[in-house]
Regions:
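Conserved acidic segment of CheY-like receiver
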Residues: 6-16, 21-25
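Active-site beta3 strand of CheY-like receiver
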Residues: 8, 51-62
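Helix N-cap/capping motif at the beta->alpha junctions
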Residues: 36-49, 72
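Two-component signal transduction core modules
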Residues: 61, 115-116
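Receiver (REC) domain active-site loop signature in two-component systems and cognate sites
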Residues: 67
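Alpha4 helix (beta4-alpha4-beta5 surface) of REC/receiver domains from two-component response regulators
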Residues: 74, 87-90, 98-115
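C-terminal output helix
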Residues: 120-130
Length: 136
C-alpha cells in the first residue's frame, strides 16, 4: 500500500537549490508531484491558474525568502490576498540560508506560513513538514 503524499511547489531562485529540493522530496515521497519555479511570480500565476489547488487535497509550498523581483515575503503578501477557497489548498513553509532573526519574526506574522526552516532541506525536514501540514 502506497502513501498518498501531497503535491509540492518549490520556489527558489537558485536552480541548484530547486534541484536538491526536488530530489529530496522525490526520494522521500515517491508518488508526490513536485513543481519548481525560480521566479515567485510564476509560482503565484500557477496557483491562480489552478484555482482550487491540485488534484490532491493539499499542496505544500517550499518558499525561499531571498529572491530577486518577488521575494518570499512579497509572495506571501500576494498569497494572503487570494480567496480562502484557493488558500485552503496550500500550506507554505519558508526556507532560508540566512540566520537573520527578523526573518523568523516576520514569517510568524503570516497566517499562511507554517514555519521557517534553514537550508538545506533534508529528508527529516520534509517528513516533519508532511506531518505538520495536516494539522492546524
Amino acid at each position: 500500500m502506497s502513501i498518498n503524499y501531497p503535491d509540492f511547489i518549490v520556489v527558489d531562485d537558485s536552480r541548484l537549490d530547486c534541484f536538491i529540493s526536488q530530489k529530496i522530496i522525490s526520494t522521500t515521497c515517491q508518488n508526490a508531484t513536485v513543481q519548481s519555479f525560480i521566479n515567485a511570480a510564476d509560482a503565484l500565476d500557477e496557483i491562480l491558474n489552478r484555482q482550487n489547488g491540485s488534484a490532491k487535497d493539499l499542496t505544500i509550498i517550499i518558499l525561499d525568502i531571498q529572491m530577486p523581483v518577488m521575494n518570499g515575503f512579497d509572495f506571501a503578501d500576494a498569497f494572503e490576498n487570494l480567496s480562502e477557497i484557493i488558500k485552503s489548498g496550500y500550506v507554505i513553509y519558508m526556507v532560508t540560508s540566512s540566520t537573520n532573526e527578523s526573518d523568523l519574526i516576520r514569517a510568524r506574522n503570516y497566517p499562511s506560513i507554517r514555519f521557517l526552516y534553514n537550508k538545506p532541506l533534508t529528508k527529516s525536514i520534509i517528513l516533519e513538514i508532511i506531518n505538520t501540514s495536516y494539522t492546524n
